[in-house]
Amino acid sequence: DVLTPATEISLDAARKISKHAQLGDLVNVDVKTQAFGRIAAQTAKQVIIQGIREAERGMVFDAFASKEHEILTATVLRILPDTGDMIVRIGGGSDKTDAMLAASEQVHGERYKEGDIVRVYVVEVRRSTRGPQIIVSRTHPGLVKRLFELEVPEIASGAVEVKSIAREAGSRTKIAVHATEENVDPVGACVGPRGGRVGAVVDELHGEKMDIVVWSEDPEKFIASALSPADVVSVTVLPGLTK
């Protein structure tokens, strides 16, 4: 019996097309394209184009989803005069795509023009009906953390851990670090020989001041350390309060 007329025909009908047809065989049927109307052909074309676009968007999303919380090199394509938002191109080859570096995610005082190269931090990659949205930033604390991970081998290996970061982008950043191995100076590791490691981070951030302090489980010690370079006489944590 024919259960699905759209894809099945009876054995008698099949043998009119191919006299050797058997049950379960596939039979090729010629379709006269002249029978299709102009609207049907246009609809088929749109469906195919839409499928290709969705496949391309999926490929772009897959390419950049793994790059969340990474630093990528971008090229400034244009700057929107009304808002100051920048359209930048990230990636290369078939994986390149455009992203927006919003004015709120730009560091005050940094100036760019079309064609400039800028390193951006990928905050998030989202799916949307218009394709993947890639949120990038120059002000996110994650940019500082990732720069130190790239410059300091002890952080990359896990011997030094970044516990917290407080950032006023373009002005000053405080980064609290902790050694997970004995005989490792976490601050010294981040500063590097002759200040080379922290200097590379500062250069990338266009002179942003960088305070590196030792993290401690003891709130009083940590607060005193975090207040450097100020001279702290004493710190008292009030019982039952968070200050």
Language-model-detected regions and their locations in the chain:
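RNA-contacting regions in translation and RNA-metabolism proteins
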Residues: 1-243
